[in-house]
Every structure is written in structure tokens, then in C-alpha cells.
Amino acid sequence: MAPRPAPNAPAVPELVLSHHPRPVTTTVDAVNERGETVPTPIAGEHPLTLYLDKRELVTLMTLGAAPEALALGYLRNQRIVRSIDELAAVQVDWDVDSVAVTSRSLARDGVTIWELAGRGDELDQRLGRRTVTTGCGQGTVFGGLMDELEAIRLPDGVQVTEAAVYSVMEQVRRHESIYKVAGAVHGCALCTNPLSGDARIVNFVEDVGRHNAVDAIAGSMWIEGVDGHDKIFYTTGRLTSEMVIKCAQMGIPVLLSRSGLTGMGHAIAQRLGMTMIGRCQGRHYLLFTGAQRFVRTGLTS
């Protein structure tokens, strides 16, 4: 059993977060099939350069709706930062299209995360190995793609009902979205997974790339202290190896998509015991992996 902290041990200071979303759409003139000029909303797309303790890591092309959560989720899903407790601040500045993430070690002791004993070499090694993924906009996964799969353990006792799958699809269909207004975005939703089947959307994020949307949800889960073991993850995009691995890292055992899947996504989901359901449209779905969790309820009419 881990020792309890001393009664007078100081609490971890709260993470300082800016709140600087960008407008998600702009309006431009387009000419329709009748030759009429029509004001038309289009999705935003902005560069956002991520710095960790003053070191530039990556420039993300993003809608800009949740930049702080996106930065945190990126660091989480790339396994660059182990815990949100390592971080002191996340500050977005759209004047220079950047987000600066500051570690507690730098804020407290003047020592960057890159200078901590054992961390610098580990991070340099991880950042030196890249896999360009199949995401629209080409996402990148640092480190060996399969390196840490053996350490991931999804919860065994979780079930998901057919009614919950239908409920998620209906909730997403009815949700107000940027896609309905402007198109050109992918959406991801974190949902509850009640045995009653009456699922609820906890968080819904859209971005110009599905890898950004899943990272933003991962960051929000960190900020809010949300556990993934009793949740369902929904995406409008295809179920690739990157999507499966990121959901597994968040501890989410059930993954839904209205789209299809890739061979490596299928293989990794099987290996992890994840329940992966694709081609979800209306009352149709295809259960690909994790049938041990799935409970049919006969709601197909």
C-alpha cells in the first residue's frame, strides 16, 4: 500500500489556464448554382505552436475552439508529460499563434523538464522517433507506436449495451455542431455508459483533424479529473491505430464511429480487449472487437 501523504503536506497548486478560444467560423461570399452571391460560414484553421518549458515541439493546425485542452491532450497522448501535476501553467497567445506550457519544476525551481535527471534523455529519444499517421492533416505520434501497449490495461468488468450505442448516436445526431453549419471538421464525443442505455454527452469537441479533437478531449479529461473506465468514446472519423491507442491511453474501453476502421486499428483493439464498433448509422452497426462486453437489447426496429 502506498504511504499516505503527511497531514500537513502542501496541496499541489492549481494549474493556471488561459481561456482564449478563437471564433470557430468566419463568413465568406460564395456563388451558388444560380449565380447568386451567398454569405457562407466556413471553418476556421489556425496555426498553434506548442512550447514546453520554452522548447518548441510542434505546430498544430486547429480550429482554435479549445487550445488549452488541445495542448494538454497532445502532451498526454504523446507521453511527453506523465501527469497533469507536472505542469504549472498553460498560456495561449493568439497574437503570436502559440501556447506556452510551463512545468512545475521550472516555475518552482527554475529547472526545465528537459533538465530533470533522467527526463531529458528520455524525452529527446522519444521526440527523435516519429510515426506520421493516417489522420487528415497527417498527425504524428512520437516514440515507438507500439512501445507502451503492454502496459495498458483496460477495465475488465465494463459492459456496453446496444441501447447505449443507439443512445450515443442519437445524442450526437441532435447535438448542435460546427459541422452542421460549416462542414470541414471532425467531431469526437466523450459519453457516459449507463447500463440503462440512456447515454449522455460529457464533452463534444470538433476540429479540423480528428487527432486534434481526441487530444482536446484527453486534455479536458485531465483538467477536470475525469476517468475513462466507465465512458464511451465516439468519433466521426475512421478507427485507426492512432485513435485506438489514444483512447486506450485514456482508459476508455468502448470506441464507436460512424466510419470504418483500418487493419492495424482492428489488430490493436483486439490485442487490448477494446470494444470497437464501426459503421454506426441509425440502427445499423458492426461490432468488430470486444464482444465480451457487448449486451444486445433487441432495439433494432
Protein language model features and the residues they cover:
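Short beta-strand-to-turn element immediately C-terminal to the catalytic PLP-Schiff-base lysine
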Residues: 191-192, 288-290
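Feature captures the catalytic cores and cofactor-binding loops of soluble hydro-lyases/lyases
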Residues: 210-288, 296-300
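Residue-level detector of solvent-exposed, low-hydrophobicity positions
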Residues: 81, 149, 292-295, 301
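Short C-terminal domain-edge/linker segments immediately following a structured domain
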Residues: 80-82, 90-93, 147, 224, ...
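Intrinsically disordered, low-complexity regions enriched in acidic/Ser/Thr/Pro/Gln residues
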Residues: 2-204, 208
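Phosphate/diphosphate-binding glycine-rich loops and adjacent basic-rich segments that engage nucleotide
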Residues: 128-133, 295-301
